[in-house]
Amino acid sequence: MAILPSKARPATPWAARRAGEDYGVHADPDWRDIDWSEHLRSAEIDGRRVQYVDMGSGDGRPVVFVHGIAGNWQNWLENLPRFAQERRVVALDLPGFGGSEDPAADVSIPGLGRAVEALCDQLELGEVALVGNSMGGFIAAETAIQFPERVERLVLVSAAGITIASLNRNVVKAWGRAAVMAGARSAAETRMAILRPRLRHMVFATLFRHPTRIPTETIFEIAAGAGRRAFRPTLEAMLDYDFRDRLPEIRCPTLIVWGAEDMIIPAHDADEFERSIPGARKVVFDDTGHVPMVERPMTFNECVLEFISEPRGQQTEDVGKPAAGVSS
């Protein structure tokens, strides 16, 4: 059984030239112009320190961003400044990742959902729009199931939770051990991989559709801050939890965003989420991999902002309507 069940295959390096003008650009406002130390905070959740970014203000509901496995808050660098122009935004390092301490108890998807809820409660955020990528989407959906009064809008970006439930556990665990060893490369080795186009393509082709088009600074930040301490226990937690039969319990407006060429989580999982969550809508970004918010940030930002800004109780066909190069 394949570890990566997607039918997508890596793009050739020269295909990057045809990726479109919105691929691999810096979004506006540019995150490089921000002193992020001014927005870094920490909170105590279950006796452990959790790091997060808190910025922006506005009349709209706050937006909370949840990263994927081996990720960190920097996964949202291309998105936070734009969202912060209109509302308060919070992006956390999940327990065991980035600048957050390891969790106090065994890692589980429901437990991570409770950690997200605890942070929202501590920050007195009220109802939020919750945005999660990959494992973060798994956690975001679980949070919406556990705490429906907290999540007013839900955005699942290449979310885990469907195909992973049917994978061979032993094979995936073996892959996880190999991934941890591969991820333990030194800062110098990582820098070499990022700066050399051919090597960058080889190392990051599973994550990004066109790695050589992603800005070097963005990859540096994501790679340098990625915490891998909790990788294996979190991977096992994902394998141990199946919430597919509970997805119909999600009642908030939900937008599903995917990359058509996602090599990590197959695009057909988006169809399953759409079928399972009442009233869910789906947007698929063409020629895009596992992290649409990094690969096509400007298109992603406007698509999601339009969705979460929709008046309460109103559902419009045009909200979440894809731009050129995006299908629904």
Please report, for each region that a protein language model flagged, where it lies by residue.
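Alpha/beta-hydrolase fold catalytic core
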Residues: M1-V63, Q85-R87, L125-G126, S309-S328
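Conserved HGGG/HGGXW glycine-rich cap/lid loop of the alpha/beta-hydrolase fold
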Residues: R48, V53-G99
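Conserved acidic catalytic loop of the alpha/beta-hydrolase fold
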Residues: G111-V128
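Gly/Ala-rich beta-loop-alpha elbow adjacent to hydrolase catalytic centers
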Residues: G132, G136, A140
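Flexible "cap/lid" loop of the alpha/beta hydrolase fold
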Residues: I145, E152-S186
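Conserved alpha/beta-hydrolase catalytic His-Asp/Glu region
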Residues: E189-E249
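Short beta-strand/loop motif that positions the catalytic acidic residue
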Residues: I250, I256-W258, D262
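Catalytic active-site module of serine/aspartate enzymes centered on a nucleophile-bearing elbow/loop
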Residues: A280-S328
